[in-house]
Amino acid sequence: MINKFFTSLLITLMITSHAYSAGSSDSSSSKTKTQYDMAVTHIKAAKNLEKKGKLDKAKQKYEKAQKLLIKSNKKKPDSADTLNYLGFTTRKLGDFENGEKYYLQGLAIDPKHIGINEYLGELYVATNRHNLAVERLEVLSGCNCKEYEDLKAIIAGEKISKY
């Protein structure tokens, strides 16, 4: 009788311990950020540094973000979100030509991408191509979004692009 009890207890403990270990969400993979996620974190930090006037530190953050995004794009190509931020960081680092290329690659994947259309419109304003900026605004016209209002004000000269 005692032998059956200990055998049952041992089996119960073994089953219970396996059940808890199988359901654990404490795996390192769930805590690991992707290169894209890390890049977005750097971009947000760079934007905050710009607001504080710390432009050199912001530039360093944009450079780190850009490197991570290039790696992310190689690992998982054809992501409009990645190409949007690649265009953004490249533009922020002063390379409008390659920034535009990234934006256009992203639009080939997702022509209605809100972020790309806004940022590409801003790039067109910055490079004195207002007619192309208006085209981006027209794409955003049905979105009922902040990006539409921001780009509209930038095109009208009522607002300066903060990015």
How would you name each of these model-derived features?
Residues 75, 109, 140-143:
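Structural marker of alpha-solenoid helical repeat scaffolds
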Residues 24-33, 48, 134-163:
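Terminal, low-structured helical/coil segments at or just beyond the last alpha-helical repeat
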